[in-house]
Amino acid sequence: MILKNVYDVFMERGFIEQVTDENAVRKALEAPLACYIGFDPTARSLHIGSLVPIMALIHLQRHGHTSIALVGGGTALIGDPSGKTEMRQILTREKIELNATCMRRQFARYLSFEDKKAMMINNADWLTKLNYISFLRDIGRHFSVNKMLAAESYKMRLEKGLNFIEFNYMLLQAYDFLYLFQNHNCVMQMGGNDQWGNMLAGVDLIRRVEGKVAHSMTFPLLTTATGQKMGKTEKGAVWLDRELTSPYEYYQYWINTGDIDVGKFLALFTFLPMEEIHQVKSLSDKELNMAKAILAFEATKITHGEDAALAAWNASAVAFGVKLIDTSLMPSSTIPRGQLSQDASAIPFIKKSWNELAKGIPAYEIMHECGLCSSKSEARRLIAQGGGYVNENPIFAFDELITTEHLDRSGQIKLRKGKKKYMIIKVE
């Protein structure tokens, strides 16, 4: 039984950009239904840019619906032109299958696949078996080339070149929706706003072939307050795989959220009650930093688990100083409200031998080697500008030696870049 209409949850939390028919969608969601969202297996891990659709699938499942994560193993062989100014590099089947396997493990962290409450399906299972002539006759005849060329996903590519393989993408995505409708009783698709044209094509195809009504809903394309694409940093993508982005780095991404985005991100990327999230509007600077810590903790907990979130919070508190979280601020959060151990094990670290440190390592070299700076020249500039620190003390010369004399009581050396990026040196 559905206790609350998930459409209202989506509206309240800012998930919805466009919808085929608001009244019809809300009515459809009054009873359990199946809804799918597509994911490209173009990398071994999903990244933060995939979190909005993942959170939507979780909300759907929590409200009694069947969430379908459709992995585009078939469509990835072609490449989606939506939102792209250039043709994507075509991956091998082996690489796509490996990525899809990794994605299944990731989805299992967010969704329960027991009793088909959620499904992960690969469209390669049917797309790679299609007969081209039959597909053109049965599916292609329902598509107007004029309408296809008017779609935003194609219009932006026409001047730079759109090849025939990519031109077929809309047909294949529409066919995915039809296939899921026919075989899994899936009546709704959700996705990024750049997919709107493809999603409407699927709704129209179901109407033409089956004479039935299907629904589509899009998410807003998120950027940060600085205009940066969601999930991008100077190091690249922020991954959901802890081997690619550690829980500590993941936590740090969220805690560095811009002030204007805190409330929006709490609504989208946590399950905290909205009446608590609304508190953010009236917070001062100090309290807003507490809200960022809660956002970072809750987001890390959802992706990496409570233990990893606690370790990341604790390491951050050790590195930056304890900031007591007011007990009245978003009390549903399980973030610690002041308890602290001195465990900084979640902070990224490198190991150096005693002999290396005894001889001394130039500061600019070790700042580059540990990954705080992308090059030695960047490290030299950073130190010259006063942005390099060892054990919270400024590094005054780029060739200042980091030695065993810098080891603290725990036998470690703490390096810092700017205000927020740390690295630990451990002796092996």
From Swiss-Prot:
* Intervals of motif 'HIGH' region: 41-50
Residues annotated for ATP binding in this entry? 232
Looking at the record, the residues that make up the S4 RNA-binding domain are 361-427
Query: Motif 'KMSKS' region at which residues?
Result: 229-233
Where is it located?
Cytoplasm
User: What are the alphabetically sorted keywords of the record?
Assistant: Aminoacyl-tRNA synthetase, ATP-binding, Cytoplasm, Ligase, Nucleotide-binding, Protein biosynthesis, RNA-binding
* Cited function: Catalyzes the attachment of tyrosine to tRNA(Tyr) in a two-step reaction: tyrosine is first activated by ATP to form Tyr-AMP and then transferred to the acceptor end of tRNA(Tyr).
Give the HAMAP family listed for this entry. Tyr_tRNA_synth_type1
Instruction: State the protein's name.
Output: Tyrosine--tRNA ligase
| Species assigned in the record | Syntrophus aciditrophicus (strain SB)
